[in-house]
């Protein structure tokens, strides 16, 4: 979701608008991505704000763009959805029973590999003046890599076209891989889950992922499931 938010941030800045990304409690998976923006003189200190700050900034002209979910309860600040009149939803997950009802634009594309892919497509045709910085292209590219398991699953023609655009915009594979690199504890836990996996009925792998000492065990468990 962070990569898609970064893309929307650049779109808003291209239009000369003040833009903020609402992030309450950054997980270990996105902290390396955020690190390049924090204390960076090219970006305002208010680029990332929490829910309380967001609610203080809302006015009649506020536009809320929700990325990578269409469920109100999954957003970083559900209250914003009821405080603003203009809401845009960009997501690649199928709709369920719980959806954001009052969006003026809801672009939900389940066939896209990721919301980052969708945002990359939008940015290509957004404005001739739009120029992604390298760090921004890296972040969006990283989002595609995560959702496609390094372009192995759910990657289609549009995925690679979006990736090519990001590479032309300055995304670098070496930098992206460094940002996504696991710490040693997460790596060991994932390896242990794979090592102890048992095969059921010849097609189902069942494993227990250790959680001791891990800040985000659910993330590590999901990574192990991709192995």
Which role does the model predict for each range below?
Residues 7-15, 40-43, 81-88, 125, ...:
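A glycine- and small-aliphatic-rich helix-loop capping segment at beta-alpha/alpha-beta transitions
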Residues 9, 71-72, 128:
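Short beta-turn/strand-loop junction motif enriched in small, turn-promoting residues
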Residues 71, 111-116, 135, 186-189, ...:
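A general structural signal for short secondary-structure boundary/capping elements
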Residues 56-59, 79-82, 99-100, 132-137, ...:
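Solvent-exposed alpha-helices and their adjacent loops that cap or buttress functional pockets
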Residues 90-163:
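Short alpha-helices
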Residues 45-105:
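Active-site cofactor/cluster-binding pocket
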Residues 36-42, 106-108:
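Short, hinge-like loop/turn segments at secondary-structure boundaries
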Residues 1-38, 54-56, 60-63, 146-227:
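Hydrophobic helix-and-loop "lid/oligomerization" segment in the mid-to-C-terminal part
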């Amino acid at each position: 979701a962070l990569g898609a938010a970064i893309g929307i941030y650049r779109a808003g800045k291209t239009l000369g608008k003040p833009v903020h990304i609402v992030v309450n409690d950054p997980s270990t998976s996105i902290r390396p991505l955020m690190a390049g923006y924090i204390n960076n003189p090219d970006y305002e200190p208010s680029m990332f704000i929490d829910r309380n700050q967001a609610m203080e900034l809302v006015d009649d002209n506020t536009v809320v763009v929700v990325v990578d979910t269409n469920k109100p309860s999954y957003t970083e600040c559900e209250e914003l959805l009821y405080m603003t009149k203009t809401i845009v939803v960009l997501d690649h997950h199928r709709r369920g029973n719980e959806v954001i009802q009052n969006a003026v634009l809801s672009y939900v594309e389940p066939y896209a590999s990721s919301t980052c892919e969708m945002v990359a497509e939008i940015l290509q045709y957004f404005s001739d003046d739009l120029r992604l910085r390298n760090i921004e292209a890296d972040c969006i590219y990283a989002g595609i890599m995560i959702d496609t398991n390094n372009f192995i699953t759910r990657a289609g023609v549009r995925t690679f076209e979006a990736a090519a655009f990001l590479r032309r915009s300055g995304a670098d594979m070496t930098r992206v891989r460094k940002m996504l690199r696991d710490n040693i504890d997460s790596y060991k836990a994932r390896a242990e889950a794979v090592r102890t996996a048992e095969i059921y009925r010849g097609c189902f792998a069942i494993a227990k992922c250790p959680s001791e000492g891990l800040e985000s065990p659910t993330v590590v468990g999901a990574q192990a499931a991709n192995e």
